[in-house]
Curated annotation (Swiss-Prot):
It is found in: Virion. One of its GO terms (cellular component) is virion component. Its main location: virion. GO terms for biological process: viral genome circularization; virion attachment to host cell pilus. This is Maturation protein A. The gene is A.
Amino acid sequence: MFPKSNIDRNYKVKLISYDKKGKLVSDDSFEQVENYLFQNRSTTYKPGYIRRDFRRPTNFWNGYRCFNQPVGTFTRKLSDGGRQVADYGIVNPNKFTANSQHLGDNMVIYPGPFSINIDQRASVEVLNKLSQSNLNIGVAIAEAKMTASLLAKQSIALIRAYTAAKRGNWREVLSQLLISEHRFRAPAKDLGGRWLELQYGWLPLMSDLKAAYDLLTQTKLPAFMPLRVTRTVGGTHNYKVRNVESAGDTWSYRHRLSVNYRIWYFISDPRLAWASSLGLLNPLEIYWEKTPWSFVVDWFLPVGNLIEAMSNPLGLDIISGTKTWQLESKLNATLPASGWSGTAKLTAYAKAYDRSTFYSFPTPLPYVKSPLSGLHLANALALINQRLKR
């Protein structure tokens, strides 16, 4: 929850001198009031209705930061044989945002170049959620022969395994499931093949069957009923910067930055929207999915998602949309002092929220997706094993 008021704190800074016998010579310690918690937000207003039962979203931003002054003790020897003991001193809290790459002094988020990829990914993926189902008849027709051949082998194996299990013949069950020793001649190829059949045969088929059933059995939507889709994509940005006006210290930032797209829309042309959701209006989508090795490209650069997003808004009208950035920022720094022994620890924390509105569907742009996720890696290993064993 975002605070609604600032908080100041009274800090005591130690500066004590001792002679060579350890006797107190002077105490120049002082106290100073500094801001600990700073918050800022945009002014709000009550939005009006742009259509019956739908209230217009508004632009809004809000943010705060908590700045903990340095904690640590420093010592140094004096020319007369004495010594001094001191704290680091007061650091201007505004240096936290001055060194930050994503947060301004007024607590407004500046996404920066780091955010371009996650922004474009979120906009494409929210457009792909506009379809009422994942059913793609166009591709299914083109793949009918391959799918039938792929599933025939699995169907026979599973039916035989099921029949053997009912009769208590567990050796036959293991044999049909490729677990018995005499059927395990090429485990890498067999396991890879079964894994690929699961990923590209069974799972898409079951998804299409469920989507077809849902589409055919769902009740008809009322005319101009507001619908909504949402998608959030985030990333972590870690970096170090040399402190401005510093004596050589380095500040380490850890930012968690995310963007959320939310779109309210209605179906203006049911026939066009229906055809679009079935994948019948975009021949590029079918052509790409049938291109050899296109799935390898999609691991790094999801061209298929981009092509699909281009036609998904067909037959739909947007009512309104919002793009919301959220930022969580943490700072850690170790502060030295020239001529002194010792270090001080500096920590700070900030959180910010920034929502903007739009009234047209976002334009899909290419983005890069990490190929090192667990599912992508498993698919890659299975495909490599398949190719090597041929």
